A protein has these predicted regions:
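Glycan-binding loop/region signatures in secreted carbohydrate-active enzymes
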Residues: 92-141
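N-terminal structural segment of carbohydrate-active enzymes
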Residues: 1-76, 81-92, 127-132, 143
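Active-site beta-loop-alpha junctions enriched in small/polar residues
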Residues: 33-35, 79-81, 165-167, 193-197, ...
């Protein structure tokens, strides 16, 4: 929900599985489920603990069991570019400053940390002080994140949807990520949140697919046509969407299908809205 915690657990998702099966669902992509101080859970506090509000690790394990029993895969959302301020390393850094062994886990510009002001003295996602950016080039940070990725695959999760992976520009990290994930489960699915041209990410050494936002823009332009509130749609991050007639829509689809290798096209996370 946009504001507040309105209920709902992973136990509830498992309970609704018959309904999802009736819809023909074969995979469930969950937004972040790890312990967090935010209702949307992009402010990760503990990467090894499913939020108790959602039922904790036990609820995820049960959901995986019942989903797999019906041939349904479960994909988690991985937020590896930044953490919440409640993450243990950032908490230690706030308490101990330059003496903290975690001082190289973040891009700190000065001490003491100014974590509760509009202008933090550390790098943060889009300048939001609630989301300090991890320093992935630090070996300990890198290994921590790779261990998280591998842990949940071995737990039984079927893949990862990666939040803002382009903001971790070092391609060697994502190559190592793929090696660790595929080493735990060669069939695991890795999809990145890349909004535009994604060819560098789809060469077989990083992601299996990306979120197909260009397709979403085309579908909205065709289905919504002149009735679409394009100003509102632009606020979603999709940009300005122009109406498409059938022939133009067909040409747009042909262009999208031709951008990548056939095996990548078939694996894309296609978004219809």
């Amino acid at each position: 929900t946009l504001r507040g915690f309105k209920g709902g657990t992973l136990w509830g998702v498992a309970e609704k599985l018959p309904y999802l099966l009736d819809l023909g669902v074969e995979a469930i992509y969950l937004n972040p489920v790890f312990a967090s101080t935010a209702n949307h859970r992009y402010h990760t506090v503990d990467y090894f603990q499913v939020d108790p509000i959602l039922g904790g690790n036990e609820a995820l394990r049960y959901l995986l069991e019942v989903a797999h029993a019906h041939g349904v895969r479960v994909i988690l959302d991985g937020v590896f570019n930044h953490t919440g301020r409640g993450f243990f390393a950032f908490q230690h850094l706030m308490e101990n400053g330059e003496q903290s062994p975690y001082r190289d886990w973040y891009h700190v510009k000065g001490f003491p940390l100014k974590a509760y002001t509009a202008h933090p003295n550390y790098e943060a996602w889009w300048g939001n002080p609630e989301l300090p950016k991890l320093k992935v080039e630090t070996p300990a940070v890198r290994e921590y994140l790779l261990a998280v990725a591998e842990h949940w695959i071995r737990f039984g999760v079927d893949g990862w949807r990666l939040d803002v992976p382009n903001e971790i520009p070092d391609p060697t990290f994502w190559r190592e990520f793929r090696q660790r994930v595929k080493g735990a489960n060669p069939e695991a699915y890795i999809v990145g949140e890349i909004w535009e041209e994604a060819d560098p990410w789809l060469q077989g050494d990083m992601f299996d697919a990306v979120m197909n936002y260009p397709l979403a823009r085309a579908v909205l332009g065709f289905v919504g046509g002149e009735a679409l509130d394009r100003d509102l749609a632009a606020q979603t991050g999709l940009g300005r969407i122009e109406p498409l007639q059938a022939l133009a829509f067909s040409h747009r689809l042909e262009d999208l299908f031709g951008r990548y290798r056939p095996e990548v096209v078939r694996a894309q996370m296609n978004l219809l809205t």
